[in-house]
């Protein structure tokens, strides 16, 4: 019989990897709480129209990458490819915006049919924040600073913030006209994908990875030249705010992001921790999305980071600096003790002892194999515990437990089997 495998691009997360994963999530949760963001959880499956209206039908995400199907009620459903549209839908459905601005964060799986590669899978995971009802340019600065500080606290090095302004809807309309006119005169020099985008989503041509197209764009009109005075002033406030916080940035005039709902501030944070600059976080302002989805015109700003890519970066940082923040975060936490036991009475006593120590807050690995003491000691060494607690029927009869150090060659010693205070003091001693 053929062995069943996970689908391509759908990766199992095993216990050791999840310890690192949860450590990163815990740090993120702390940062979000300190900044006043509350967690929201939305379904992984949504009506397809949510993403067609929200993301834009001309985008690659909607046109090429979504997992879409009809359910048994013949409703078109889609596994969510990103989190923002779902958060906005939930906020509208539950009337959250009537209560004033909402600061929300989320974490969970997303789905896109892309070519799997390191740090990018077809089921991938994002952590993101959405500040609904935030009109001020200072809010843009605050959410960018939140992302920057989170990544820095994870020990991620080589960070670079790329920044651009996409302007207002009118600004982009004027720029689109100028860009299309310029590109149409040179359409024979464009790569195939860029020619296809010329009449559907021309701004995405700026993000082309084709080297010849990038070289051609060096002479193209820039979006900055199409910004109205109000948009320029707003962008200047963002830059000044970041400078006042000591957050360095680089203006990137071709940064447009991949989703249609962005306006004004757009940004990406990259890291060279993997050898080349890799994007670990991206976002920006989206003042029109809530209105597009049936709500009142409401300004908003947010970002998302990809957990798979971030974990690669964090682990690279840990390898580069074994004593740094990343190494401490990604270290697999071993149990406080491994409970070795053999014999009918010892097995009963070991179960009671393990439960008592766990209830007191310790991590105890209880061996239930019934194997020989030598085999159990080998397992104890492999698990990384500092101590082995040894119980045989003889120890139980004497009312004691043998403590065997595993991290050095010091002598074994005994403590009372029911001396929980003494055991706790010893097992938690540095």
Curated annotation (Swiss-Prot):
GO terms for cellular component: cytoplasm. One of its GO terms (molecular function) is ATP binding. Its EC number is 6.1.1.21. Its main location: cytoplasm. The keyword Lipid biosynthesis does not apply. It catalyses: tRNA(His) + L-histidine + ATP = L-histidyl-tRNA(His) + AMP + diphosphate + H(+). GO terms for biological process: histidyl-tRNA aminoacylation. It is found in: Cytoplasm. Keywords: Aminoacyl-tRNA synthetase, ATP-binding, Cytoplasm, Ligase, Nucleotide-binding, Protein biosynthesis. It comes from the Bacteria. Gene3D superfamilies: Anticodon-binding domain (3.40.50.800), Bira Bifunctional Protein, Domain 2 (3.30.930.10). Homodimer. Belongs to the class-II aminoacyl-tRNA synthetase family. This is Histidine--tRNA ligase. The gene is hisS.
